[in-house]
Amino acid sequence: MDPMLASASVIAAALAVGLAAIGPGIGQGNASGQAVSGIARQPEAEGKIRGTLLLTLAFMESLTIYGLVISLVLLFANPFA
């Protein structure tokens, strides 16, 4: 494999994971903060808020996992080589 192509693939893989983690990380922080605020205001709705929060966090985390999969494809099954 061309060394330039290999180094570009490594940089692209690092950017894929890094950029894919920024948005969900910020979103998870905001969602968790709002859930804590909602539970503090209405403690009787804790179960419903927590269930919705966990489902939402799982969907947000899937975006990061997609970035990880793309980076693994770039590193080990490089379509450009």
Swiss-Prot record:
Keywords assigned: ATP synthesis, CF(0), Hydrogen ion transport, Ion transport, Lipid-binding, Membrane, Thylakoid, Transmembrane, Transmembrane helix, Transport
Record carries keyword Disulfide bond: no
Parts of the chain that traverse the membrane: 6-26, 57-77
Site keyed Reversibly protonated during proton transport: positions: 61
Keyword Cell inner membrane: no
Short name of one Pfam family: ATP-synt_C
Compartment(s) of residence: Cellular thylakoid membrane
PROSITE patterns in the record: ATPASE_C
Membrane topology: Multi-pass membrane protein
Record SUPFAM superfamilies: F1F0 ATP synthase subunit C
Subunit comment: F-type ATPases have 2 components, F(1) - the catalytic core - and F(0) - the membrane proton channel. F(1) has five subunits: alpha(3), beta(3), gamma(1), delta(1), epsilon(1). F(0) has four main subunits: a(1), b(1), b'(1) and c(10-14). The alpha and beta chains form an alternating ring which encloses part of the gamma chain. F(1) is attached to F(0) by a central stalk formed by the gamma and epsilon chains, while a peripheral stalk is formed by the delta, b and b' chains.
Xref: HAMAP family: ATP_synth_c_bact (MF_01396)
Protein's name in the database: ATP synthase subunit c
Species name: Gloeothece citriformis (strain PCC 7424) (Cyanothece sp. (strain PCC 7424))
